[in-house]
């Protein structure tokens, strides 16, 4: 017997409206495709010479039939067939509950986003990806556990954020790819073609007023449709499990898993803010000011997007949807079992080093003692590693892969830039070391409350 009903009549009926909206969206896209996209090449078998809109007309018809099936199939939810099968959900849960797979997937997705930008910014490709994600969302809503996570009032804005961020990223890359092509062909930039001045009053003010009214209406309907996520007064004898920070701090909360509070909660956020403020002063490339581009500022854009997507947005998604009770990893269709316990046998770098088979027989394992000299000897491998990372890497980078940047920035600006980049890289490095080797601290000095 299942632990809960995956589908009820009200859920099926609600999904019927959801698919009806998708049908209307694709009906509009069919009309747009008929006007814009033309026909398939005559060289393509079976569909050669056929309007491209025919494909979207078929998609619209399928979505309409799915919507009708939901409206007419509410009498017996147990036998309703349009749902995700277990053979699909189980592998997804298995792999998504693995942080290594999740992080590697986010890195691959980031790389594909940059490398294949000229492909996915095309209208038809982007629309196809949007529809696939919406259909996946609708099918996933047939699972009770997924629905509980996504439909939680606290998590609704996270789902909206994913689509909004994706849309804004698409807008940027679409304009950047277009301008890169214009620069190569010697044509005027997109921003230079329509640069007519617009009056603040009434043009700009009217536009802002309309946006204000629409956003106010959205917030009103949001407040009516979703209950405020208010909980009972805080109690020292009852702690929520999981106890999560607000969504905009989930990235920092995830960092607390891998670093001490002083580092994850104070130093790293301070470096992030300081780095953002330092960007105008260390940036030597004046290209790309006032217009979208990618190729002229590829390194700077990739660096920023790497910090924004894999190291921030991905951590918010991870903390929202994949972290459950006891801060364990759960799949998106998995039951959040409070009794699930995963033993963690984390060790410090000093234990790895001094217990190495060759060294342990000579020195007798990790040095014991609480005096300063013993502590420094014990943590010498980590101290040397961290010192070498921040002291030796900037010159090495400046003489090799970033030689051009050293020449154009100068020593001072380059060392500021390289150290900021090294601090940004330390988060994924520490995450991978924890997952691969169960490494807790590179430098662990609990006697001084100093751990890295």
Locate the predicted segments by residue.
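Hydrophobic cores of alpha-helical transmembrane segments in multi-pass integral membrane proteins
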Residues: 12-38, 49-82, 93-144, 154-179, ...
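Intracellular loop-helix junctions on the cytosolic face of multi-pass helical membrane proteins
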Residues: 183-202
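Soluble extramembrane regions of membrane proteins in the secretory/endomembrane system
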Residues: 2-7, 86-92, 147-153, 182-187
